[in-house]
């Protein structure tokens, strides 16, 4: 077995959810959360959500294109190359694409002082891909 695995994002993309690229699930990563998100036709990149229940902070990185994040009602401009760290797990956040081809990487961590625990929501959404 090789010491690494590799995959192109088009190989990782969900058939049922083409805007979501389930990187963590694809590689079986259990120590942190990681996904890629493509802008949808309606401009949505990442739907509004928070992590108040699981306490997990998140880092977002705009890989390509241009996104606008809305965090606790405040709009944050995020052109390609921008990192946004949402340290307050309960803060609502969402991202929209300002241009076609926008791609955002999200990385989730466990609450401070704990390890990461996969929430399982990604497996639920992937059931239709089998």
Predicted regions: what is each one?
Residues 1-3, 8, 96-130:
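Double-stranded beta-helix
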Residues 1-48, 124-130:
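A short, N-terminal "cap"/entry segment at the start of jelly-roll beta-barrel domains
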Residues 31, 56-59, 101-102:
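Short, surface-exposed beta-edge/turn micro-motifs
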Residues 36, 63-64, 71-73, 88, ...:
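Residue-level recognition of conserved beta-strand positions in structured domain cores
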Residues 49-53, 92-93:
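Histidine-centered active-site/metal-ligand motif
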Residues 52-69:
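Short, conserved beta-strand element in jelly-roll/cupin
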Residues 66-68, 92, 101:
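Structural motif
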Residues 72-90:
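Short acidic-glycine-tyrosine-enriched beta hairpin
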């Amino acid at each position: 077995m090789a010491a690494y695995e590799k995959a192109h994002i088009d190989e990782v993309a969900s058939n049922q959810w083409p805007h979501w690229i389930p990187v963590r699930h694809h590689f079986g990563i259990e120590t942190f959360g990681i996904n890629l998100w493509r802008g949808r036709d309606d401009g949505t990149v990442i739907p509004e959500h928070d992590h108040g229940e699981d306490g997990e902070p998140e880092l977002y990185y705009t890989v390509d294109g241009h996104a606008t994040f809305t965090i606790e009602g405040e709009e944050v401009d995020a052109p390609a190359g921008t990192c946004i760290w949402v340290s307050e797990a309960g803060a609502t956040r969402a991202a929209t694409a300002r241009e076609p081809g926008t791609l955002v990487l999200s990385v989730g961590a466990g609450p401070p002082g704990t390890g990461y625990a996969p929430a399982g929501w990604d497996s639920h959404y992937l059931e239709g891909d089998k």
